[in-house]
Swiss-Prot record:
Molecular function per GO: amino acid binding; ornithine carbamoyltransferase activity
UniProt organism field: Burkholderia cenocepacia (strain HI2424)
Pathway field: Amino-acid biosynthesis; L-arginine biosynthesis; L-arginine from L-ornithine and carbamoyl phosphate: step 1/3
UniProt protein name: Ornithine carbamoyltransferase
Keywords attached to this entry: Amino-acid biosynthesis, Arginine biosynthesis, Cytoplasm, Transferase
EC assignment: 2.1.3.3
Amino acid sequence: MTAKTIRHYLQFKDFSLEDYEYVLERTGILKRKFKNYETYHPLHDRTLAMIFEKSSTRTRLSFEAGIFQLGGHAVFMSTRDTQLGRGEPVEDSAQVISRMVDIIMIRTFEQDVITRFAQNSRVPVINGLTNEYHPCQVLADIFTYYEHRGPIAGKTVAWVGDANNMLYTWIEAAQILGFKLRLSTPPGYALDMKLVSPDSAPFYEVFDDPNEACKGADLVTTDVWTSMGFEAENEARKQAFADWCVDEEMMGHANPDALFMHCLPAHRGEEVTAGVIDGPQSVVWDEAENRLHVQKALMEFLLLGRLKH
């Protein structure tokens, strides 16, 4: 594979609508194989390097189990244990690591790190999470919606809470997949427009009142108020976000059959009440499991392209 043919997955916008239609279809197929205990090893003897600067439960488990279920192997690499954590240039690490493995997943702080890594990699690189974007999680959310309600095109998604990596990824997804995003963030925590494409403006709307943002929504979603790396702001954020807790009253403004999602970990009583996240509209456990299935489809697609089936 030459450098020109390598595809990376660093932001949601890296794939086209047609790519997503294929990957979502493959996700459903791979999930059915998993549920039926079918052996399927298209990535036999392929190796995934997992580089973690930010710790994780769901990201590590889903990628490590996923590559194993596809017949491959995973190598866990922490910046505490590698030269990346000792000051080796990202570009040099990318050159070395990509000569020894078939695909790389990175979970780190700055998007610039993963961008530079991909620019110097001989193999596909996947964004497992950065401060700016979280494409694998939103892809899992989209598939979860599809499972429960069908295509998300033309639907309305409400985002309540912090303007974080999830929200910026939802904005990109709205533009590509053709749904409307209604969002509400507290004063002082508005969108950083440097991370938002002007072309996406028709696909999202900003509301001061989170209840207003939820009106007519088919899906209501949120995240923690304090993301990893912002712990020093925790107390200030708790005060600022107090009215942005998704509770039963707020869900009442959404459509009666609206779903609730949260990428986890959740803090009951902060960004969401127990009554909502543990209630009948919540699909958070399906959402968490689907990280496994969408990432298997993603790795298969990046390494093998479109399969004839």
